[in-house]
Amino acid sequence: MAPPAAAPELGSCCICLDAITGAARALPCLHAFCLACIRRWLEGRPTCPLCKAPVQSLIHSVASDECFEEIPVGGGPGADGALEPDAAVIWGEDYDAGPIDLTAADGEAPGAGGEAGAAGGSEAGGGAGGAEAAGEARGAGAGRAAGAAGGRAGRGADAAQEFIDRVARGPRLPLLPNTPGHGPGAPYLRRVVEWVEGALVGTFAVTARELAAMTDYVMAMLAECGFDDDGLADAMEPLIGEDDAPAFVRSLLFVAARCVTVGPSHLIPQQSAPPGGRGVVFLDTSDSDSEGSEDDSWSESEESSSGLSTSDLTAIDDTETEPETDAEVESRRTRGASGAARARRPAERQYVSTRGRQTPAVQPAPRSLARRPCGRAAAVSAPPSSRSRGGRRDPRLPAAPRAAPAAQARACSPEPREEGRGAGLGVAAGETAGWGVGSEEGRGERRAKLLGEAGPPRVQARRRRRTELDRAPTPAPAPAPAPAPISTMIDLTANAPARPADPAPAAALGPALAGAQIGTPAAAAAVTAAAAAPSVARGSAPSPAVTAAATGTAAAISTRAPTPSPAGRAPAADPRRAGAPALAGAARAEAGRNGNPGRERRPASAMARGDLDPGPESSAQKRRRTEMEVAAWVRESLLGTPRRSSAALAPQPGGRQGPSLAGLLGRCSGGSAWRQ
């Protein structure tokens, strides 16, 4: 016997997923399968693998409309015209049809018994003994109905148990407990949870929390015991009761089996749905060349939509480079290998995508250029260039010539600007080179000039203020006042005002100078004592002429002969220190102990070194030096304090007279020395 011929024009078989060999069609749906595959399938499942319709017969070896072979199938209509009710139940297609009555009639209509009884009654009513015949007929009919009902119930229970056993043995989905939120452990267990809740609500009067706890317990025991009805019944006895537990467990297992079974609906063939529909689309590996058949129309459309079609691929011959023109060859020779690729694209303005809108790309000035002291950015910002490989660069404007290094160094120098310097070399060189850098400007001003702005208001105000200060003429120094002599007298009496007192008249100096040798310390002391006499005696103030005469006489006496130096010490070479009373050391030490604590206090050696080259003095230093000189003179001349050092501090040119000594003398001696 020749092997069955293949029929690739019919597509692939949904059972073996191969080309159909020995085509056979199921009646009445006319779905095509392999003859061997569909016969094995129908041995335990009298339904079509595609549409789940009951199969009446198989048609194969079709030569024409009148020449074919037919194989009857047990799943077709029986002699009484009824269909097999177990097919849809086994494969779980009637989940939404409600609970299944396992005791329903298997092959008879619900009114079959009634019709038979009515027929018997009508036949018996014709004779004289119709009543008795009708009674016998009703009794016989009732007996037959009871026997049929018991048989149908037994067959239904056996079918349900057989279905549960088949699901437990075959491949199925796992049974899972509920989640912590009292939900089903998997989506396919939702109907099991709903059935358990309905059964518990119909049996017990419980609250929502109690119902959730009981449902979780039932689902946990179902996941633990599985399809073991004895173990599950023992676990349900404390909750349901010993009498009701077996029936509850049998119904629970039947509902769970319907939800976890795996039917042939997971094997959707190529012809079950159009392209783009739901289901798994299997690839057609046949070598069919027929294009005119209707069955192949689905294959052609699926080939274009499956993503595996090679019709849109580029052939190898089409990937060769196009011949270049003479212009392109010349352009590549002049600009290099990358120039030829960029020359194929027109010079267009570059754009950047901003969520659907096309806006010109703007390239801001980088901040790194603003931080450089000598800017390198061009005066005019260049247009953005294309970042794509082989793109043409946009033309750039030529940059301004850069200033010479010497000019840049002078522009960046920190020296102050002179009159008219703002418009001079530094600003001109900086603006020409394209970077705004001034001689005293900071980072903010350089950044403002680089960005083409005048800068913030505070920067503008600081720039104007510095310019005004630099351009303002320098005032001429004021002439220093003549130094006041140390011998200027001050009225130191208790009730006298703190004002200078004139020295004694020249006539009063004669007796004092008569007994003293000119140029000796005794003569100088006599002159000083005579000058202080009017102040102590509260005399009248002499005229300025007398004061000038006394001052000149004392200076002449002190300069006629040099002051003899101590033994073993050379005479002083400084004319300022020659002939002056050397009381500066003691005065400085005493002033430091009494009224000069802190930063202005210096040792005597440092002050002595400063006397040789005093340098410029501040107003505070001059005032302090004057106070120390007057205090030293007061202690030596009036209080009789012995000298401690021969170093004397001569008056400096340009110095000025210190303040009044009333406060100083009152702080030193309390004023008691002057009232005695």
Curated annotation (Swiss-Prot):
Residues 474-484 have a biased composition (Pro residues). Residues 110-135, 422-439 have a biased composition (Gly residues). SMART domains: RING. Keywords: Activator, DNA-binding, Early protein, Host-virus interaction, Inhibition of host innate immune response by virus, Inhibition of host IRF3 by virus, Inhibition of host mitotic exit by virus, Inhibition of host RLR pathway by virus, Metal-binding, Modulation of host cell cycle by virus, Modulation of host ubiquitin pathway by viral E3 ligase, Modulation of host ubiquitin pathway by virus, Phosphoprotein, Repressor, Transcription, Transcription regulation, Transferase, Ubl conjugation, Ubl conjugation pathway, Viral immunoevasion, Zinc, Zinc-finger. Signal peptide: none annotated. This is E3 ubiquitin-protein ligase ICP0. The gene is BICP0. It comes from the Viruses. A zinc finger (RING-type) spans 13-52. PROSITE patterns: ZF_RING_1, ZF_RING_2. The keyword DNA repair does not apply. Residues 304-314, 375-388, 397-411, 555-597 have a biased composition (Low complexity). Evades nuclear antiviral defenses triggered by dsDNA viruses. Acts during the initial stages of lytic infection and the reactivation of latent viral genome. Prevents the antiviral effect of nuclear bodies by degrading host PML and SP100. Residues 101-135, 266-486, 555-676 are annotated as: Disordered. It catalyses: S-ubiquitinyl-[E2 ubiquitin-conjugating enzyme]-L-cysteine + [acceptor protein]-L-lysine = [E2 ubiquitin-conjugating enzyme]-L-cysteine + N(6)-ubiquitinyl-[acceptor protein]-L-lysine. GO terms for biological process: protein monoubiquitination; protein polyubiquitination; symbiont-mediated disruption of host cell PML body; symbiont-mediated perturbation of host exit from mitosis; symbiont-mediated perturbation of host ubiquitin-like protein modification; symbiont-mediated suppression of host cytoplasmic pattern recognition receptor signaling pathway via inhibition of IRF3 activity. Residues 286-303, 315-328 have a biased composition (Acidic residues). Its EC number is 2.3.2.27. Auto-ubiquitinated. The strongly acidic region might serve as a transcriptional activation domain, possibly regulated through phosphorylation by casein kinase II. Residues 440-450 have a biased composition (Basic and acidic residues).
